[in-house]
Swiss-Prot record:
<protein>
    <recommendedName>
        <fullName>Phospho-N-acetylmuramoyl-pentapeptide-transferase</fullName>
        <ecNumber>2.7.8.13</ecNumber>
    </recommendedName>
</protein>
<dbReference type="GO" id="GO:0008360">
    <property type="term" value="P:regulation of cell shape"/>
</dbReference>
<keyword id="KW-0131">Cell cycle</keyword>
<dbReference type="Pfam" id="PF10555">
    <property type="entry name" value="MraY_sig1"/>
</dbReference>
<keyword id="KW-1133">Transmembrane helix</keyword>
<dbReference type="GO" id="GO:0071555">
    <property type="term" value="P:cell wall organization"/>
</dbReference>
<comment type="pathway">
    <text>Cell wall biogenesis; peptidoglycan biosynthesis.</text>
</comment>
<keyword id="KW-0812">Transmembrane</keyword>
<dbReference type="InterPro" id="IPR003524">
    <property type="entry name" value="PNAcMuramoyl-5peptid_Trfase"/>
</dbReference>
<keyword id="KW-0479">Metal-binding</keyword>
<keyword id="KW-1003">Cell membrane</keyword>
<dbReference type="GO" id="GO:0005886">
    <property type="term" value="C:plasma membrane"/>
</dbReference>
<dbReference type="Pfam" id="PF00953">
    <property type="entry name" value="Glycos_transf_4"/>
</dbReference>
<feature type="transmembrane region" description="Helical">
    <location>
        <begin position="289"/>
        <end position="309"/>
    </location>
</feature>
<dbReference type="InterPro" id="IPR000715">
    <property type="entry name" value="Glycosyl_transferase_4"/>
</dbReference>
<comment type="function">
    <text>Catalyzes the initial step of the lipid cycle reactions in the biosynthesis of the cell wall peptidoglycan: transfers peptidoglycan precursor phospho-MurNAc-pentapeptide from UDP-MurNAc-pentapeptide onto the lipid carrier undecaprenyl phosphate, yielding undecaprenyl-pyrophosphoryl-MurNAc-pentapeptide, known as lipid I.</text>
</comment>
<feature type="transmembrane region" description="Helical">
    <location>
        <begin position="263"/>
        <end position="283"/>
    </location>
</feature>
């Protein structure tokens, strides 16, 4: 438990102290966000606000994670980084770097368009497939890998193996699934990052839920507690530490990103957090449960899909603007009202998800 607290606290401190340094540096260098002309008119006043604040989030997560492990040397239970934790951390940093390239191109060209779609999808594919391949390696002494090829809700669904038939074909199907998952979640968080504090606040809530669930998995791991309700997760404690680091980093950044935002996380932050969300869902065996906990991200994405499909097929737009947070904003809701209400919705989704997780455990005991 102490490792989790240290990781979250250190990440919060790093983020809250490092973010203003980035604000001053980026302001001095004129690295400000360009605002799309077709966006809400009220957002034009945000033009020039420093961006790429996701750098602080990534540094905070990495720093908190490794310092938590370093501090564990001085506690009764020394704990080393694990394959699962390092793989999710690597995916987070890799997605963040991809987002950084996107942000940098936007700033270099002074327009709100960065990497083209093909370039971004290719980068996501390389990172997702690399993550997926490595997740099938690193077998521990209990015969567990960082990921399972079986689809999971709260735990593996034994009758639903994604790698149908096994072998090379089965592995390729599994890697395709991982690619879809990573791409979907990273883009979903990216779409949510459209209002001051929205993505940071909602992701913080999701990270809190995952820190709780993975700690419960650790306390009831089959490696130490071979009960009928135990969890077949390779490194649950390390995942809990990493989720706590994500929580702390988001809260520390939110201090400066809350309305009126002094800095934006940019694609650097949103893609990194999307990678963290996807990685945690895979390594904790909760891919389907993440849809419940991260339902707001799902709603944001679906609103864009509906808007595009409807306009292309009928010429009509069902929403005033997509993603859906802009629909409410253009409908007269104040930006802060939309953000706070979406935080509340995310909290309710998180409670529902954690309740389902715990209800499953009760059903087995």
């Amino acid at each position: 438990m102490v490792h989790i607290i240290i990781g979250g606290a250190v990440s919060f401190i790093i983020a809250i102290l490092f973010t203003p340094i980035l604000i001053r540096r980026f302001s001095d260098e004129g690295l400000g966000q360009e605002i799309r002309e077709e966006g809400p008119r009220s957002h034009l006043r945000k033009r020039g606000t420093p961006t790429m604040g996701g750098i602080a989030i990534i540094v905070a997560i990495v720093g908190g994670y490794f310092l938590a492990h370093l501090a564990s040397v001085f506690t009764p239970s020394s704990y080393k980084p694990t394959a699962s934790g390092l793989l999710v951390l690597g995916l987070t940093v890799g997605m963040g770097f991809l987002g950084f390239l996107d942000d940098y191109i936007k700033l270099a060209k002074a327009r709100n368009l960065g990497l083209n779609k093909k370039g971004k999808l290719l980068g996501q594919a390389v990172l997702a497939i690399g993550f997926g391949v490595l997740c099938l390696l690193f077998l521990n002494e209990h015969g567990l890998k960082p990921a399972s090829t079986k689809l999971s809700f709260v735990r593996d669904i034994d009758t639903f193996d994604i790698a149908i038939g096994g072998g090379i074909i089965g592995t390729l199907i599994f890697l395709l699934f991982i690619y879809i998952l990573v791409t979907a979640w990273s883009n979903a968080v990216n779409l949510t990052d459209g209002l001051d504090g929205l993505a940071a606040g909602t992701t913080a809530i999701v990270m809190a839920a995952y820190s709780i669930m993975t700690f419960w998995q650790f306390r009831n791991s089959c490696a130490s507690n071979a009960s009928v309700a135990c969890y077949q997760v390779r490194d649950p404690l390390d995942l809990s530490i990493l989720a706590a680091c994500g929580l702390g980093a988001c809260l520390g950044f939110l201090w400066w990103n809350a309305a009126p935002a002094k800095i934006f996380m940019g694609d650097t932050g949103s893609l990194a957090l999307g990678g963290l969300v996807a990685g945690l869902s895979v390594t904790s065996r909760t891919e389907l449960l993440m849809i419940v906990i991260g339902a707001l991200f799902v709603a944001e994405t679906i609103s864009v899909v509906i808007q595009v499909v409807s306009f292309r097929s009928t010429g009509k737009r069902p929403f005033r603007m997509a993603p859906i947070h802009h629909h409410f904003e253009n409908g007269g809701w104040a930006e802060t009202t939309v953000v706070v209400r979406f935080w509340l919705l995310t909290a309710m989704f998180a409670v529902a998800g954690v309740s389902m997780f715990y209800a499953d455990w009760l059903g087995w005991t």
